Amino acid sequence: MAKKSSVEKNNHRKDLVKRFAEKRKALLAIANDESREMEERFEARLKLAELPRNSSATRIRNRCEMTGRPRAYYRKLGISRVALRELGNRGLIPGLVKSSW
């Protein structure tokens, strides 16, 4: 089980990303538009740098919904390998069978 503070920190980052998504997208569009003047693009980069670091989507860590584990995360299911194994052994995931040969 992950520390509650780590999970909460990640949830806070998700909230910040949602809150600043439109502003960040607009500033990036201005900064990357080569048809605009260099000063305008530079000002957009400065405003982008003033945004909180945690408002960038790359700072979000995928975590298991059940345990909060940050590694061995299956994107399709939203859980870690440990949780997947537990649920699979209980027969709670349809179509998942233990392989044997």
Swiss-Prot record:
Pfam families: Ribosomal_S14 (PF00253)
One term of GO molecular function: structural constituent of ribosome
UniProt KW keywords: Ribonucleoprotein, Ribosomal protein, RNA-binding, rRNA-binding
InterPro entries: Ribosomal_uS14 (IPR001209), Ribosomal_uS14_bac/plastid (IPR023036), Ribosomal_uS14_CS (IPR018271)
Keyword Nucleus on entry: no
CC terms in the record's Gene Ontology section: cytoplasm; small ribosomal subunit
Single GO biological process annotation from the record: translation
Coiled-coil residue windows: none
Domain of life: Bacteria
Biological function: Binds 16S rRNA, required for the assembly of 30S particles and may also be responsible for determining the conformation of the 16S rRNA at the A site.
Quaternary state and interactors: Part of the 30S ribosomal subunit. Contacts proteins S3 and S10.
HAMAP family: Ribosomal_uS14_1
Family: Belongs to the universal ribosomal protein uS14 family.
Protein name: Small ribosomal subunit protein uS14
Source organism (scientific name): Methylorubrum extorquens (strain PA1) (Methylobacterium extorquens)
Gene name of the encoded protein: rpsN
